[in-house]
């Protein structure tokens, strides 16, 4: 067996299948751009879903890839086991209705055993198959020469996700030798069992049946191959190391952590070894995820990153690292992965900045949070319970930034659990909107429909013309072929030549009409058919439309004109965002309609008002410069050398369409644009907001829509000026004057309230009682707010010199409570914080504070008198 690096194994796999006629699919972004059902890209096949479910027909039915993936369903096991990871690479080869079992098995065996490739000893390989898969058995036994005793039949060797494609699978296992298990009485010591000796190398799935809704299985018209090989596991076998963490894919990060911490990996301390592994795994995940546009936050993908970083920080304390350091590992990850993922090193400064910022935020609260957690655990043990309440867990999350899973890990070490349901109840009360976690879902759907069968050619000519003579070459109604559509009927059709743009790249579809003698057909929408043609959704308004009919296709030019203004404006906006906010900004989604444009982009903070103003002005300056928009076809490599922006998640062919706005903007884009920026007229931002997980959104209008918006705003300004009895240019002066008047009135009101408070405080001194030699005053008073309550408390403490005072007021059915204890009584054990907590609890509230002054709130005004009566009991209890 050869000595290979992880990078060499990856490249060798791709080279092998390229020799077998496969197209190499680039590794897609970890953030899914075309599949809202996925939180992360979680497998090699996840990015190929569009091919397997028939929505898109691939140019080459043979595909291979090395796909970066994230799975987060068992984070708590990372570091504890030899092979659990949150970030991993899946190597795969796929067939979309082309080759099947014999080729898949033959090539897998060749790659693993040939001296030209991996060069495994055949005697160390075993395979598992489904008990009824005789075809696979025959191929393995008779053609590959694997003896019967090393072909194990297992019931679980059947890939099935419910409805949709399914089929048997075969797995290949490598025997690492007796050092990893030699107790043959162990019922799990076999290929496919839970053991460390026989490691799964490769899983080949033979997708040959359709699992129908009624539970039956029928053969698929086209059989598919879907295989997966984990790069990290394969590397551990080739490099003959005990765990994936001991490979060259992880050891550089572990080595850097050794240098930072002064501790040693594999020095006999299993707890420290676990910390090294957690840090190495989590920094890989965070580095790649941030590089692909995800940012730490409290929801969705951002929450996963925050949880991983904070878990790593928590484990770093076991290595005596008490400062931000994870950001220093980002360039180390980049160096390890640079052969296949050069973009990590290109973005390392930005990624490190994001990681450092998140580390610093957590370090600010970590010490206090751990102290609070220690108190909570100690209190629970005193109360003879092994459960940390949901309220306490939520407080740790909300105030100290402890993800619930982190609290659960701390609790587990203390032999306790967390009331997760109680935590969720507290979350539900607190959050303003539902944050339902999306689950990773299965990768394929039911195959079917006639659209995938339509192979007739169709040419889009809409870049240069708005009307053309065409022929209807395919006509579909209710998912089936049809020869005609009557007036009032809806259907789908394909034209041999069409000026109608199909929705893509965020740009909405054209609309318009198809006209013939006595026939008028409304084109409502246009989408891409599975084989790439423009598929028109239509409704017949007049006459009968027949297949092969000659029609005149005419787009709505007024609608198109507004759309192209907004589309070119998004390109200008994209570049302006990079110029103002930084090169880390990347498009995360867009919508271009005739009325407005919406642009989503990666950014880790709110865009400030002055930044928005600068961005808006930059875009308008480019419009006013009347720059020609040039569109050309270029080879992909030439376009990239020119500096053209390629968008995350987009797949490009060998020849791409380049949209260039002077020397300012250069993007790969298949959309429609203005000929000159002057056509846009004017650009106006109407909103900027966060849409979660480090993604911001700008909404804007151009042309007529921008004019109408500004006209409306001028109208509102005039109306407001009229109500203030001034003119628009003087409205700010008028507003400043009104604010000054209000401020003066507030000042006079506060002065009057203070005087009244002082008078009431003087009257209250007559109500002071002596309890066990201590002056006690507990009274309900009439004041406007807590500030007035504090003023009154200060007056009373000064007047009484030595006293325990509790004041309560009721406003809008809410109770404010303030407790005060003079310095001489604090030394005797009296504590305002403890007292106010008890008083508040008796009128439906809570609170606390310092020994000398503390405040609280209550919800039940009717119980205030009863709550104040407790003050005497408290004084008696302390004086005993």
UniProtKB/Swiss-Prot annotation:
Keywords: Aminoacyl-tRNA synthetase, ATP-binding, Cytoplasm, Ligase, Metal-binding, Nucleotide-binding, Protein biosynthesis, RNA-binding, tRNA-binding, Zinc. Its EC number is 6.1.1.7. GO terms for cellular component: cytosol. Its cofactor is Zn(2+). PROSITE patterns: AA_TRNA_LIGASE_II_ALA (PS50860). Zn(2+) binds at residues 567, 571, 669, 673. One of its GO terms (molecular function) is catalytic activity, acting on a protein. It catalyses: tRNA(Ala) + L-alanine + ATP = L-alanyl-tRNA(Ala) + AMP + diphosphate. The keyword tRNA-binding applies. The keyword Ligase applies. It is found in: Cytoplasm. InterPro entries: aa-tRNA-synth_II/BPL/LPL, Ala-tRNA-lgiase_IIc, Ala-tRNA-ligase_IIc_anticod-bd, Ala-tRNA-synth_IIc_core, Ala-tRNA-synth_IIc_N, Ala-tRNA_ligase, Ala_tRNA_ligase_euk/bac, DHHA1_dom. Binds 1 zinc ion per subunit. One of its GO terms (biological process) is alanyl-tRNA aminoacylation. Gene3D superfamilies: 2.40.30.130, 3.10.310.40, 3.30.54.20, 6.10.250.550, Bira Bifunctional Protein, Domain 2, Threonyl-trna Synthetase, Chain A, domain 2. It holds the Pfam family tRNA-synt_2c. Consists of three domains; the N-terminal catalytic domain, the editing domain and the C-terminal C-Ala domain. The editing domain removes incorrectly charged amino acids, while the C-Ala domain, along with tRNA(Ala), serves as a bridge to cooperatively bring together the editing and aminoacylation centers thus stimulating deacylation of misacylated tRNAs. Catalyzes the attachment of alanine to tRNA(Ala) in a two-step reaction: alanine is first activated by ATP to form Ala-AMP and then transferred to the acceptor end of tRNA(Ala). Also edits incorrectly charged Ser-tRNA(Ala) and Gly-tRNA(Ala) via its editing domain. Belongs to the class-II aminoacyl-tRNA synthetase family. This is Alanine--tRNA ligase. It comes from Bacillus cereus (strain ATCC 14579 / DSM 31 / CCUG 7414 / JCM 2152 / NBRC 15305 / NCIMB 9373 / NCTC 2599 / NRRL B-3711). The gene is alaS.
């Amino acid at each position: 067996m050869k000595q290979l690096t992880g990078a060499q194994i990856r490249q060798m796999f791709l080279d092998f299948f390229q020799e077998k006629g496969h197209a190499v699919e680039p590794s897609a972004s970890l953030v899914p751009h075309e599949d809202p059902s996925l939180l992360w890209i979680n497998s090699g096949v996840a990015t190929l879903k569009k091919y397997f479910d028939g929505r898109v027909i691939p140019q080459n039915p043979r595909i291979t890839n090395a796909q970066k993936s994230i799975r987060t369903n068992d984070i708590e096991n990372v570091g504890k086991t030899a092979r659990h990871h949150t970030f991993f690479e899946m190597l795969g080869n796929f067939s979309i209705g082309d080759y099947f079992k014999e080729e898949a098995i033959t090539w897998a065996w060749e790659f693993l055993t040939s001296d030209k490739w991996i060069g495994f000893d055949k005697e160390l390989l075993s395979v598992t198959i489904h008990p009824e898969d005789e075809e696979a058995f025959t191929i393995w036994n008779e053609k590959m020469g694997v003896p019967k005793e090393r072909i194990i039949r297992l019931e679980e060797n059947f890939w099935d996700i419910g409805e949709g494609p399914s089929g048997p699978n075969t797995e290949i296992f490598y025997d690492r030798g007796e050092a990893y298990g030699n107790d043959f009485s162990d019922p799990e010591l076999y290929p496919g069992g839970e053991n460390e000796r026989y490691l799964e190398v490769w899983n080949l799935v033979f997708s040959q049946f359709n699992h129908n809704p009624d539970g039956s299985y029928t053969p698929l018209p086209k059989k598919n191959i879907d295989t997966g090989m984990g790069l990290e596991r394969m590397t551990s076998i080739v490099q003959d190391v005990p765990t994936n963490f001991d490979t060259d894919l992880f050891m550089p990060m572990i080595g850097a952590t050794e240098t930072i911490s002064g501790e040693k990996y594999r020095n006999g301390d299993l707890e420290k070894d676990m910390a090294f592994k957690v840090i190495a795994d989590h920094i890989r995940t965070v580095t790649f995820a941030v590089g692909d546009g995800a940012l730490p936050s409290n929801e969705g993908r951002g929450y996963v990153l925050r949880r991983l970083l904070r878990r790593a920080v928590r484990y770093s304390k076991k290595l005596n690292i008490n400062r931000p350091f994870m950001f220093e590992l980002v360039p180390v990850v980049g160096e390890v992965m640079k052969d296949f993922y050069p973009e990590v090193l290109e973005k390392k400064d930005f990624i490190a900045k994001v990681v450092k910022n998140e580390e610093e935020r957590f370090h600010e609260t970590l010490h206090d949070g751990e102290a609070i957690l220690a108190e909570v655990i100690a209190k629970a043990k005193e109360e003879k319970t092994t459960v940390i309440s949901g309220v306490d867990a939520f407080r740790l999350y909300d105030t100290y930034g402890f993800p619930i899973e982190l609290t659960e890990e701390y609790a587990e070490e203390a032999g306790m659990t967390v009331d997760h349901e109680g935590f969720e109840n507290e979350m539900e009360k607190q959050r303003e909107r539902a944050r339902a976690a999306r689950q990773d879902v299965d990768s394929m759907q039911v195959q079917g429909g006639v659209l995938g069968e339509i192979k007739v050619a169709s040419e889009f000519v809409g870049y240069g013309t708005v009307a053309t003579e065409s022929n209807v070459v395919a006509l579909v109604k209710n998912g089936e072929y049809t020869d005609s559509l009557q007036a009032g009927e809806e259907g789908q059709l394909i034209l041999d030549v069409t000026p109608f743009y199909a929705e893509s790249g965020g740009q909405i579809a054209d609309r318009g009409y198809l006209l013939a003698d006595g026939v008028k057909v409304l084109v409502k929408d246009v989408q891409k058919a599975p084989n790439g043609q423009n598929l028109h959704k239509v409704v017949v308004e007049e006459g009968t439309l027949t297949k092969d009919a000659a029609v005149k296709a005419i787009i709505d030019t007024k609608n198109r004109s507004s759309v192209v203004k907004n589309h070119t404006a998004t390109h200008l906006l994209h570049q302006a965002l990079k110029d103002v906010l930084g090169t880390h900004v990347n498009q995360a989604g867009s919508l271009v309609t005739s009325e407005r444009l919406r642009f989503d982009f990666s950014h880790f903070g709110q865009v400030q008002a002055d930044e928005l103003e600068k961005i808006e002005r930059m875009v308008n300056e480019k419009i006013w410069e009347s720059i020609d928009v040039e569109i050309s076809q270029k080879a992909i490599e030439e376009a990239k050398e020119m500096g053209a922006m390629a968008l995350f998640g987009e797949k490009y062919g060998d020849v791409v369409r380049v949209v260039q706005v002077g020397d300012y903007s250069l993007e790969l884009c298949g959309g429609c644009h203005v000929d000159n920026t002057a056509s846009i007229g004017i650009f106006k931002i109407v909103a900027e907001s966060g849409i979660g997980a480090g993604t911001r959104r700008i909404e804007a209008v151009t042309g007529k829509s921008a004019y109408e918006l500004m006209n409306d705003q001028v109208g509102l300004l005039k109306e407001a000026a009229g109500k203030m009895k001034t003119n628009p240019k003087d409205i700010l002066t008028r507003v400043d004057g009104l604010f000054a008047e209000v401020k003066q009135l507030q000042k006079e009101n506060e002065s009057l309230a203070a005087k009244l408070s002082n008078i009431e405080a003087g009257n209250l001194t007559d109500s002071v009682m002596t309890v066990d030699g201590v002056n006690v005053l507990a009274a309900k008073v009439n004041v406007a707010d807590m500030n007035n309550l504090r003023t009154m408390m200060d007056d009373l403490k000064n007047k009484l010199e030595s006293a325990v005072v509790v004041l309560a007021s009721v406003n809008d059915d809410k109770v404010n409570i303030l407790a005060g204890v003079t310095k001489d009584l604090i030394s005797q054990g009296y504590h305002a914080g403890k007292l106010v907590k008890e008083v508040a609890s008796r009128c439906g509230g809570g609170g606390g504070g310092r020994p000398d002054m503390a405040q609280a709130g209550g919800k039940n005004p009717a119980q205030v008198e009863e709550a104040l009566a407790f003050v005497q009991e408290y004084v008696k209890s302390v004086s005993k």
